[in-house]
């Protein structure tokens, strides 16, 4: 597709706080009222959904009716199911060609999307291919030749498959960019633009982004036709049900002793521990192992097979404590996690909700504990102010709360 002309420049409808101004207020309160396929409804209810979330009430209908949609929403709002349901509704499962493409910033998120979409489409006989680096190109080519309806992938591998003529984009009717801000911040702009140019001129574009920096606005202005704009406000991305505490560790080098003390007090079912660097993840994992704590770790330097194994063990519960960087903070759904420890406060305040939202997602209760040095005091206050929340000093009775 080539650049399109819009009646409204989207950058003109973003306020000083970086929030997009919505232009669509139709709300559908029930999945039954969305005119979805019967088999798709079975998949939705079988997945465990009872009623649509705020973004699902607003975005599914315009997406299923072919409109271009920009949704400003973060992890934990139900956005993956929003575009998954929309794609499953729009595609013809009897046509064996690729009809929808979803791009995501990380392999883990792409795999998560594929799993959610497959579960929702359980009764539809739909073939969905995760198209990601670290896996066999030849296998992907074989599967595409055999017949795939939906491709979910990362920009690098998707672009590669298009260039090899393995991925035919000529019949794609719906193109979804998930976490567009994250993809662009990782330097994928050229690849994303190349993929856009390979699309049919009339392709429907759905873009989801937690923030609206200028790079995202450029994409919306160039490639989307008078899009419907939907904002799921910050206060709908609830921290409700998550008890948030901090421990004043004073110095960075005292964090490890503090973590060991916490282990002695708390019986951890499953926990995620976030560090800001890969090196710190490795160092902390080594120290914990030396001290007879069973932990696993995950970061971007690992190969795909290793990362898959670690995530599988953690999801199944055979691994109980996962030490990771922000690679896990966006979009990876680990249902059993009751405790999140920010060993380092996130360097980006937007990532705070991505990290701790994991512990209380979809109404589950959870506890988040932040290790705070003297240098972090101001940052902690900024996080409290940004989310209009309160982070209390950790009480001695913490074991009763987890």
From Swiss-Prot:
Keywords per UniProt: ATP-binding, Helicase, Hydrolase, Initiation factor, Nucleotide-binding, Protein biosynthesis, RNA-binding
Broad enzyme group: hydrolase
Coiled-coil segments: none
GO biological process, one term: cytoplasmic translational initiation
InterPro entries: DEAD/DEAH_box_helicase_dom, EIF4A_DEADc, Helicase_ATP-bd, Helicase_C-like, P-loop_NTPase, RNA-helicase_DEAD-box_CS, RNA_helicase_DEAD_Q_motif
Binding residues annotated for ATP, in chain numbering: 73-80
Catalyzed reaction equations: ATP + H2O = ADP + phosphate + H(+)
Entry EC number(s): 3.6.4.13
Domain Helicase C-terminal stretches: 241-402
Assembly and interaction partners: eIF4F is a multi-subunit complex, the composition of which varies with external and internal environmental conditions. It is composed of at least EIF4A, EIF4E and EIF4G.
Record-stated family: Belongs to the DEAD box helicase family. eIF4A subfamily.
Identification of the protein by name: Eukaryotic initiation factor 4A
Gene responsible for this protein: inf-1
């Amino acid at each position: 597709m080539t650049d399109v002309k819009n009646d409204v420049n989207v950058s003109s409808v973003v306020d000083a706080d970086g929030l997009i101004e919505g232009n669509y207020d139709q709300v559908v309160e029930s999945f039954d009222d969305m005119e979805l396929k019967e088999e798709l409804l079975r998949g939705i209810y079988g997945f465990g959904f009872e009623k649509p979330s705020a973004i699902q009430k607003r975005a599914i209908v315009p997406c299923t009716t072919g409109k271009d949609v920009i949704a400003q929403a973060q992890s934990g709002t139900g956005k993956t199911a929003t575009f998954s349901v929309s794609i499953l509704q729009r595609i013809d499962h009897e046509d064996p060609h690729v009809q929808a493409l979803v791009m995501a910033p990380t392999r883990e998120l792409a795999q998560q999307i594929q799993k959610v979409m497959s579960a929702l489409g359980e009764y539809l006989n739909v073939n969905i291919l995760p198209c990601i680096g670290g896996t066999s190109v030849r296998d992907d080519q074989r599967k595409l030749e055999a017949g795939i309806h939906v491709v979910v992938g990362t920009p690098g591998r998707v672009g590669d498959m298009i260039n090899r003529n393995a991925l035919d984009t000529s019949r794609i009717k719906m193109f979804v960019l998930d976490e567009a801000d994250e993809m662009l911040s990782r330097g994928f702009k050229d690849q994303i633009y190349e993929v856009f140019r390979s699309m049919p001129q009339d392709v429907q574009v759905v873009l989801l982004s937690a923030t609206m920096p200028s790079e995202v606005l450029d994409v919306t202005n160039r490639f989307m036709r008078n899009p419907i704009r939907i904002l799921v406000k910050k206060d709908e991305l609830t921290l409700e049900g998550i008890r948030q505490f901090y421990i004043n560790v004073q110095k960075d080098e005292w964090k490890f002793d503090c973590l060991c003390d916490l282990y002695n007090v708390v019986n951890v079912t499953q926990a995620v521990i976030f560090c800001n660097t890969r090196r710190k993840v490795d160092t902390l994992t080594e120290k914990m192992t030396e001290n007879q704590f069973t932990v696993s770790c995950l970061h971007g330097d690992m190969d795909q097979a290793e990362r898959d194994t670690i995530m599988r063990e953690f999801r199944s519960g055979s691994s109980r404590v996962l030490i990771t960087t922000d690679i896990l903070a966006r979009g990876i759904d680990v249902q059993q996690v009751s405790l999140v420890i920010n060993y380092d406060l996130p360097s980006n305040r937007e990532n705070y909700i991505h990290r701790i939202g994991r512990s209380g997602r979809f109404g589950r209760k959870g506890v988040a504990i932040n290790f705070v040095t003297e240098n972090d005091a101001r940052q902690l206050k900024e996080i409290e102010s940004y989310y209009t929340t309160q982070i209390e000093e950790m009480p001695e009775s913490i074991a009763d709360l987890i």
